Each structure stands twice: as C-alpha cells, then as structure tokens.
Amino acid sequence: MSQLPIRYEFIKSCKQTGARLGRVHTPHGSFDTPVFMPVGTLATVKTMAPEELKAMEAGIILSNTYHLWLRPGHDIVKEAGGLHKFMNWDRAILTDSGGFQVFSLSEFRKIEEEGVHFRNHLNGDKLFLSPEKAMDIQNALGSDIMMAFDECPPYPAEYDYMKRSVERTSRWAERCLTAHQRPEDQGLFGIIQGGEYEELRKQSAKDLVSLDFPGYAIGGLSVGEPKDVMNRVLEFTTPLLPADKPRYLMGVGSPDSLIDGAIRGVDMFDCVLPTRIARNGTLMTSEGRLVVKNAKYERDFRPIDENCDCYTCKNYTRAYIRHLIKTNETFGIRLTTYHNLHFLLKLMEQVREAIREDRLGDFKEEFFERYGFNEPNAKNF
C-alpha cells in the first residue's frame, strides 16, 4: 500500500536548513514539493478557471468533503464520474475528511466513540459523521489523496482532554483504513494530533505510523496558537514521521509560515488565506501586504506588484482594481485572487529553488526582512 497510489520521491535536502525537496506521484500526475495547494471548497477555487490554475502551475488542489457532501451531494459527484470529471480538473486533488468543518462550523455537536452528531450549518438539520461515512464520501468523490477522520480539539485544550482526543483519533484512523474501499487508486493520509504537548504528539505519531499510511498530516495547528508555538510543535513532530512519505501541514498559508514550515521538513500546505483575503482587496506582494481599497491607491496607476509577472500585474492598475473591489465587481475579485494564488505558487517555486541551491536560510532572512516579519509586532495577513 505504501507504494501505490501515492508515492513520495525524495530529491535532496537543503544543507543550510534541512528542508526537503521532493516530488509526490499520484494517479493524476506528479507535483514538486514543498507545495502550496489552492483550496477549492465546493469543487471550485473561487472565481478561478481550472485552465488559469494550470497556467500558474498548480499541480494539486484541495476540496472539502463536508461541503460537497451537503451540496451537491457525493452521490451526484460519483454519478458525474468523480470530482476530477465533475470539475474538469485532471491534476491531483486532495480532500479533507470533514472533521475540521464539523468542529468549526457547527454550533451543536456531540462527540461519541461512533462519530460526531452535529447540525448542518446551512439549515440546522441533524447530521452524523463517522470515520466510515467520511471514507464513503471521499471514495465517492474519487480524490487522489483522502484524509482520515479525526477529532479537531480547540486551542488551547487541557492535557487530559487532549490525551483522550488523541486516543480517539488513533482508533478512528484504524477504522478509516478498514472502511477505505479504493486503496488501489486513492491514498489515505493519517492525521497527527496532540496540540502543543510533545508527549501526545509522540503518541499520536507512533500510533499512526504503525498503521503505515502512504502519507501523514500534522493537524491541530494554525488554530489560533502563537507562531512560536506552531514552529516548536513542528520541530518535535516532523522528525517523528517517516522520511519516505509526504508530510502535510493543514491550514497554513501565510508566506512566513510556509517558509518556516518548509525549513522544519513539511512538504505540503493548504489554506483559504490567499483567496479569502483577495475578496477583501488584500494582496500579497514582494514588498509586503497591500490593501488596495485604501484611499491612497485611488490614483495609483502602477501594477499591484512591479516585480510580479502574473496576468493581473501585467494588465491592470491598483486604481482600476481598487475601483472594482469598491464597487463589488466580480472581475475585481478574480484579479486579486489570481494575483494572490500566483504569488504563493511562485513563492513555493522560489523556496524549492533555494533548497536546491542550499540557501533557504538566506532566502528566509531576505524575505522576512523585506516583509517586516522580523519585527517584534510584525503584522500578518
């Protein structure tokens, strides 16, 4: 199972930082790592056409099991021939298990050994999601990489609560493996939990590595903890994971965290950040963040980023994009979304290049300096 259908090829590590350069092979093509995965919650990366994502060299995107289960329904996606055909995307797709949405969107929830009872966030209907159901939905969706159903504890959480949660996540992971119907063409990743407790991360990693998943995710981070806590947890967690399998840090997408994660041995990242902030007119640039709605850009006829070669920056000005965002024009959101995704995918290309040339530490220093991330009260996105 560890060879198919998901295989990790190690290329080299950075002599300066230990970051890994690699390639993940899937039934729908390969992609180089470290990689950022754009999020297509409802089988679409909001406002983007698949051809545009390919043009910016996205090799894999993420879709949400919970949202697709509710709308249009996994049965409809299956009938369409699976998610790839349904959304006309022939590269790799990763689906999450639905766990995070159940724990973050639903007001009412009751966790039992069998699974989680909760209310549909759209209409209040009672729903139940279990490891078996999460596998059933993802098998129907036909993603290349599926995620095990885990419990997503809040931050901060007491040690005893977290210990029980980790034990349950391990039992659920085993049930996911048993319920997985398509191991020959869909790879199932396990999720390491344990909050900020090193002992519990060790236990979680030991349990899940013994089950021999083809890849592992580090869950329970980017949930409100300070950055130094996240970095510390990564430092003691990634070494616990097999070097010949991909490592995925869930829900992380700010430029500084992508670089910090890569330095700590992470291969895959996803986050709604670039697309979500784009809709508010916040842009990532080589000089830091730019809020295009600000009055000072009203007569600014320069591109968003003069160092960027994306479609948006080659063709449109800050003044024009500001006007579109201020008047709620959809085209404005398309332009800002395109730019932010292009920026992050390009950043990861630069990270891979820096690893190849053994200079990721230098790259981080220069980037953080330019962005102001080194300052004590550095503002994030």
Swiss-Prot record:
It catalyses: 7-aminomethyl-7-carbaguanine + guanosine(34) in tRNA = 7-aminomethyl-7-carbaguanosine(34) in tRNA + guanine. Binds 1 zinc ion per subunit. Residues 251-257, 275-279 are annotated as: RNA binding. Zn(2+) binds at residues 308, 310, 313, 339. One of its GO terms (molecular function) is tRNA-guanosine(34) queuine transglycosylase activity. Its EC number is 2.4.2.29. Homodimer. Within each dimer, one monomer is responsible for RNA recognition and catalysis, while the other monomer binds to the replacement base PreQ1. Belongs to the queuine tRNA-ribosyltransferase family. This is Queuine tRNA-ribosyltransferase. The lineage of its organism: Bacteria, Bacillati, Bacillota, Bacilli, Bacillales. The gene is tgt.
